[in-house]
Amino acid sequence: MGTAELKIILEFSAGAELLFGNIKRRQLALDGTKKWNIANLLKWMHANILTERPELFLQGDTVRPGILVLINDTDWELLGELDYELQPNDNVLFISTLHGG
């Protein structure tokens, strides 16, 4: 086929998976002909795999406060947050700290 793919892994934990069809781990093959950053990834996720209550995951163009984002086990705040450019085989983990009581 010859189309370039950017393969990454998404993981959801501590309740975040409930917003994504209760699937804790997804392997994605994104269009490798464009540059992907976290901002683009969040838009793609909203359009393609976010199945429940997007307001619990997204706030504007970013994740809600209370959603931790780790890229290859590193806090995304150290990597540039929305501007981080995804690399092949990156692992992006979303952890919800929002729990009812």
Curated annotation (Swiss-Prot):
Crosslink (Glycyl lysine isopeptide (Gly-Lys) (interchain with K-? in acceptor proteins)) position: G101
One BP term from GO: tRNA wobble uridine modification
Modification comment: C-terminal thiocarboxylation occurs in 2 steps, it is first acyl-adenylated (-COAMP) via the hesA/moeB/thiF part of the MOCS3 homolog, then thiocarboxylated (-COSH) via the rhodanese domain of the MOCS3 homolog.
Primary location class: cytoplasm
Record pathway: tRNA modification; 5-methoxycarbonylmethyl-2-thiouridine-tRNA biosynthesis
Annotated positions of the 1-thioglycine modification: G101
Protein location: Cytoplasm
Keyword Mitochondrion: no
Keyword terms, alphabetized: Cytoplasm, Isopeptide bond, tRNA processing, Ubl conjugation pathway
InterPro entries: Beta-grasp_dom_sf, Mopterin_synth/thiamin_S_b, Urm1
Record-level GO cellular component terms: cytosol
Family: Belongs to the URM1 family.
Record's protein name: Ubiquitin-related modifier 1 homolog
The species this protein was found in: Drosophila ananassae (Fruit fly)
